[in-house]
A protein has these predicted regions:
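Mixed-charge (acidic/basic) macromolecular-recognition segments
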Residues: 157-232
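DNA-recognition helix of helix-turn-helix
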Residues: 231-241
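Short, surface-exposed, charged/polar-biased interaction segments
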Residues: 43-44, 54, 199, 228, ...
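DNA-contacting interfaces and partner/effector-binding or oligomerization modules
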Residues: 1-155
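Short, charged/polar micro-motifs that form catalytic or ligand-binding hotspots
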Residues: 12-27, 190-197, 206-210, 238
Length: 241
């Protein structure tokens, strides 16, 4: 968490966060989630490493963190630039759904070699479930749900048909991001969509951090709204932050 909510520059890292990354920023500040995260840590283990890929495994077919919309996450004290977060595909429309075929398959798909990707990746294995693959590059993330062949081996990847209407826009953006990743090996800033509400969310996040730190209403008002307007904007005990 940001230890000094009064330092506006301490929130500069949020300027280009996507919607999924903003979700993490707010979730990691939830005390009940932090407690749930601590109790779930023995559920996961590290299978090993393959080039730039870290391989994780969950003991349960349905990880307990799904109650919070997650399959896995690193520690809540890590901000969106450094955290590893697997969102539940049922809740996160940007998770790209794909099928992996062997190289010998006669399909129109370019071979995909995970080792050729320059940015870091994490592979989460869930018993009796599909593979979950996350690419992370300087705070930008792309999450894939992959069925079929093991993606750590050379495969051919195809998207799982036309997405539903309510998922189409997010899936097309993720597919564009994946195609650029396949070509360049990186997740460029232009390939990950910044949430247009970021300036507003940054302000809300500062207010939340101030409240969590125990700051009073007048103190928050003086810092965020300017001292001369604090009493006017923040008067009245019934007004919510």
């Amino acid at each position: 968490m940001n230890s000094d909510w009064k330092d506006n520059h301490g929130y500069d890292y949020t300027a280009r966060l996507s919607r999924r990354e903003w979700a993490w920023e707010f979730l990691r500040r939830n005390a009940c989630f932090c407690e749930a995260w601590r109790t779930c840590q023995l559920e996961y283990g590290i299978l090993g490493y393959d080039a730039g890929t870290t391989m994780l495994v969950s003991q349960f077919e349905t990880p307990r963190l799904t109650e919070w919309g997650l399959l896995y996450s690193s520690a809540p004290d890590q901000d969106a630039l450094t955290a590893i977060v697997f969102w539940s595909p049922e809740l996160c429309s940007s998770v790209l759904r794909m099928t992996a075929f062997p190289l010998s398959a006669r399909i129109d798909a370019t071979p995909f070699l995970l080792r050729d990707i320059a940015c870091a990746s994490v592979l989460l294995d869930v018993p009796s479930g599909p593979q979950h693959l996350l690419f992370a590059d300087e705070g930008r993330g792309l999450q894939l749900l992959v069925e079929g062949e093991e993606v750590v081996r050379p495969v051919r990847l195809l998207t799982n048909g036309a997405p539903k209407a309510d998922l189409a826009s997010a899936q097309l953006r993720s597919l564009h991001c994946f195609n650029e990743l396949r070509l360049t090996g990186r997740l460029s800033p232009s390939s990950v969509q910044r949430d247009p509400l970021s300036p507003r969310l940054r302000h809300v996040l500062r207010v939340l951090d101030a409240d969590l730190s125990g700051a009073g209403r007048e103190e928050i008002g003086e810092v965020l709204l300017a001292e001369g307007r604090a009493s006017e904007r923040w008067q009245g005990s019934g007004r919510a932050l």
